[in-house]
Amino acid sequence: MSESVIQGSNPDRVLSPTSSKSVTQTVNGSHQFVIQGYSLAKGMGIGKHIASDNFSVGGYQWGIFFYPDGKNPEDNSSYVSVFIALASEGTEVRALFELALVDQSGKGKHKVHSHFERSLDGGPYTLKYRGSMWGYKRFFRRSILETSDYLKDDCLIINCTVGVVVSEILCPQLHSVHVPDSELGSHFGVLLDSMEGSDITFNIAGEKFLAHKLVLAARSPFFKSKFFSEFEANNTEVTINDLEPKVFKALLQFMYKDSLPEDVEPATAHTFERLKLSEIYETLIVKVLAAADKYDLIRLRLLCESHICKGVSVKSVAKILALADRYNAKELKGVCLKFTAENLAAVLETDAYQQMKDECVTLQSELLKAVAGHEEGSNSTGGAKSQSVWAQLSDGGGDTTSRHVRQRTT
């Protein structure tokens, strides 16, 4: 005798609950419509409009229609009309709208009709076909408009915002595939360390470095033009006399691994305050900065600038400004000029500034401009202290252009 057992449902088994969430929101976009020559547009006729260029919001095309003589006969005598029109074929769209006539006096008193940030009893407006519109037949009384700050130099400006309603169901992502970080740098790093397949040798002060032409050409426009030119393409050895081996090694580190070498000096304010400018020029990071500028390695130059920027202080900024100017470090130079302008009185008292003033005469005029821009941006009221600082900067620079800069007074 045999017995068969049919497995049924297990009432004691509890399944894990599932969940989902419906999210409805708007995808917003804006368009500005400038109407130049309003007085010439008047009289074009009832129901005739000036249309903006089409613009895209939420995957649909839209347009703004301005009716200088009104959209309907009953509105012609008193009002201009403004509408937003659906310019896409096909499906119906639910959306929120805002129309704003810009106050051109600068007072910010715009004439705004908006669905946003207020409760709508009937929900968003539905446009069902191309050419369907939302707007106002009586948008603005014409007689008031023509004597208002909304009309300036015969020009009107209308800002339009459209918020297309979209819904989606969000479910927990139970499964995923992990993608590790890019290994490109590490793979090229292995290539640098092994130099397998190298096809170019660099002789740097008697020390030999192997490399790959394609890697260097991809990283540096200088090397690309060097290796792919008609006269240099077949060269397998290059001698460079104006670089130290450790600097060229740093260039290779960057071109293969996209990073600075680990033996670059820490950049601290104390380091740059302690060293003389001539000693700063001999540091590895500054030599790498100079080489990056020469060999058109823009990202390496920015890495160096970012590293050196950590050392900016009242006592060091003049030195760093001088080296930034010397090696075309524009971002670093901008930081130094801004820092100096913000801390002008203290910087002018430092020995480093006095040395920079004598050795980098052309920087004086740039510093004057930076200070002027800073004071204008902060709405400075001047005062005796501010004026004395200006006098010290203007008269003590040694720059013939700065001697003619007139001191600003308030």
From Swiss-Prot:
Ranges where the BTB domain occurs: 198-264
Coiled-coil regions listed: none
Subcellular location: Nucleus; Cytoplasm
Main location: nucleus
Domain free text: The BTB/POZ domain mediates the interaction with some component of ubiquitin ligase complexes.
Domain of life per record: Eukaryota
Tissues with expression: Ubiquitous.
Keywords for this protein: Cytoplasm, Nucleus, Ubl conjugation pathway
Gene Ontology biological-process entries: cellular response to salt stress; cellular response to water deprivation; protein ubiquitination; response to osmotic stress
Naturally occurring in which organism (per UniProt): Arabidopsis thaliana
Keyword field contains Cell inner membrane: no
GO CC entries: cytosol; nucleus
Cited function: May act as a substrate-specific adapter of an E3 ubiquitin-protein ligase complex (CUL3-RBX1-BTB) which mediates the ubiquitination and subsequent proteasomal degradation of target proteins.
PROSITE patterns: BTB, MATH
Induction: By drought.
Designated name of the protein: BTB/POZ and MATH domain-containing protein 5
Keyword Amino-acid biosynthesis attached: no
Family of this protein: Belongs to the Tdpoz family.
Stretch list, region Disordered: 1-24
